[in-house]
Structure formats: structure tokens, C-alpha cells
Amino acid sequence: MARYRGPVEKIERRLDADLGLKGERRLSGKSALEKRPFAPGQHGQRRAKISEYGLQLREKQKVKFMYGISEKQFRNYFKEAVRREGNTGAILISLIEQRLDNVVFRMGFATTRANARQFTTHGHVLVDGKKVDIPSYLVKPGQKIEIKEKSKSNPQVVRALELTNQTGMVDWVNVDKDKVFGIFTRIPAREEVVIPVEERLIVELYSK
């Protein structure tokens, strides 16, 4: 599946979930989901009853759109989660949380994961002092994530860091806002990752 490039707020309304796709706008209370909390289209206000399969598929779609990953990438993450010992759903979410673009977002260097992905592919991100321009790179505990020196004054980065005063920072990263770098201290437990997803339904979907 190609990456979706249409209006992201329609996706949030269709999936009936705040996926953090609009960044700063969602903090203003002016997002389309808050103004029109129903599906887009002529009959959007009358949501049809969703089948069990539909519910399972919706949870998978939430993860894919939230983290900006393709169907192929998602399947690979799921296969790896199944291979590892433990709760498959929890491992799946933890794996995806290790993506470099997501860690850049979690550290407050970008207002959305899409911006973090773009920033990464354009070569503005260093991992342990070396440029890594692959958004799907899995960050390991203890690794240092830094914005390149000439990009630290980028207005988007500055604004994103300012917004962390309002949104806060997750517990599994340690960030120096002045020097614009952070340490990915550990892989988060599933209960720490606050996202509107029931991964149990995703596991059921792939268990058929």
C-alpha cells in the first residue's frame, strides 16, 4: 500500500480516533475531529455498525496511519513480534516505537511523526554522531539521537521543542533541549505508550 497523502484529518474522523496527525493544531482545539466528531461524507453522522473484522482492520489502520508505515513494513513488524517471546501485541507496539522517526518525534524535535520522517530522510538526524536517513531504523537503548548542528536553529525544531512545555515528554527518553539531543534510555512498556489502539484485535486479525 502506498503512503496516504490526502487530508489526514479525514483519516482521524473515519477511524474515530485522535492519531496526532495534525501536530500543533490538535492542541488548539480546532481539529476537524473535535469540530466534526463523525465520519466524513454525506452519511457520516450515522456510523454503520462495524463487523468484528471491520473492528480488527480499523485497529491495524490506526497504527499504520499514526506511525506512517506501509502494509509491508507492518507485516514485517508483526512477524518479528510473533517470533519474540511474550505478548505479541505489546511487542508489536514496542517495536514500532523504536523507529527512528518516532523517537525523533517523541524527543520533541518535530510536531508530528510525518515531520520527523521528513526531517530524517533529509539527513538532519544523527545517531551516535553519524547521519542516519532511514526512518525505519530501530533505535537501541542507550543510543544518542541528535539534530545536526546547522539544523538545530530550524524554526520547526525550535517550535516543536517549545510545545513540549505544553505536551510533556515520555519517560523513556532523556532530552537536552538546549543542545537538541536526547538519549533513548529504554524500550517502553506497552502501558506507557498512550495511543488509542487495541492491539489485541490486530493479533486476532492475523491469527485467522
From Swiss-Prot:
Q: Which UniProt keywords apply?
A: Ribonucleoprotein, Ribosomal protein, RNA-binding, rRNA-binding
Per the record's keyword annotation, is RNA-binding included, yes or no? yes
Q: What Gene Ontology terms describe where this protein resides (cellular component)? A: small ribosomal subunit
Q: Name one GO biological process term.
A: translation
Q: Which residues form the S4 RNA-binding domain?
A: 98-161
A GO term, aspect molecular function = structural constituent of ribosome
- Tell me the SMART domains matching this sequence: Ribosomal_S4, S4
TM annotation in the entry: none
Q: Name one Pfam family in it.
A: S4
Q: What does this protein do?
A: One of the primary rRNA binding proteins, it binds directly to 16S rRNA where it nucleates assembly of the body of the 30S subunit. With S5 and S12 plays an important role in translational accuracy.
Q: Which family does it belong to?
A: Belongs to the universal ribosomal protein uS4 family.
Q: Subunit structure, briefly?
A: Part of the 30S ribosomal subunit. Contacts protein S5. The interaction surface between S4 and S5 is involved in control of translational fidelity.
Write down what this protein is called: Small ribosomal subunit protein uS4
Q: Which organism is it from?
A: Aliarcobacter butzleri (strain RM4018)
Q: Which gene encodes it?
A: rpsD
